[in-house]
Curated annotation (Swiss-Prot):
Alphabetized UniProt keyword annotations: Host cytoplasm
Organism of provenance: Spiroplasma virus 4 (SpV4)
Protein location: Host cytoplasm
Functional note: Participates in the assembly of the viral procapsid in the cytoplasm. Released from the procapsid upon genome packaging, possibly through affinity displacement by the protein ORF8, or by proteolysis.
GO cellular component: host cell cytoplasm
Name this protein carries in UniProt: Internal scaffolding protein ORF3
Chief place of localization: host cell
Length: 149
């Protein structure tokens, strides 16, 4: 007897260049307690994105499909002007968004370090690395002294 669990337990793309993906459902064999997966549906992501189409901005697409799927997205229509953007443009936009978040975080860290009189993050890391080298040198000297005794 097979026991079917809820759908969406597993999603797989046909291959990294394909926009087709399959939705699987976990199946538990009640007798053997063995878990397997069976395909319950196959979708074409390109069709889904085209349906989303007009008025869909990149951020909402990334929110909906996730950054993990960005490289698998086919050319997509963004905004209301029916512009078709290639995958590389989406990747560049994703990098820009990540860099903006990173720069904001870096600015926040630098501000906190500066308030504590530690300079900016670059100086903080440089000083930390130098202190680690000094600690390693001290350990090395102590080990040499023990060996000499």
């Amino acid at each position: 007897m097979k026991i079917y669990t809820q759908r969406n337990n597993k999603v797989e793309f046909s291959d990294s260049g394909s926009s087709e993906y399959s939705e699987y459902q976990r199946v538990i064999d009640a007798d053997t307690k063995e878990n397997t997966y069976e395909i319950v549906a196959t979708y074409n992501r390109y069709d889904e994105i085209q349906e989303a189409g007009e008025g869909t901005d990149l951020r909402s697409m990334l929110d909906k499909y996730g950054d993990d799927y960005l490289e698998l997205l086919p050319p997509a229509r963004l905004g209301g002007d029916d512009t078709i953007l290639p995958k590389s443009v989406l990747e560049l936009e994703n990098i820009r968004l990540q860099n903006t978040e990173y720069l904001s975080l870096l600015e926040n860290i630098n501000s906190k370090l500066d308030k504590q009189g530690l300079g900016d993050l670059d100086n903080f890391i440089k000083n930390w690395q130098e202190s680690q080298k000094k600690i390693e040198n001290e350990k090395g000297k102590k080990e040499d002294e023990k060996e000499n005794e």
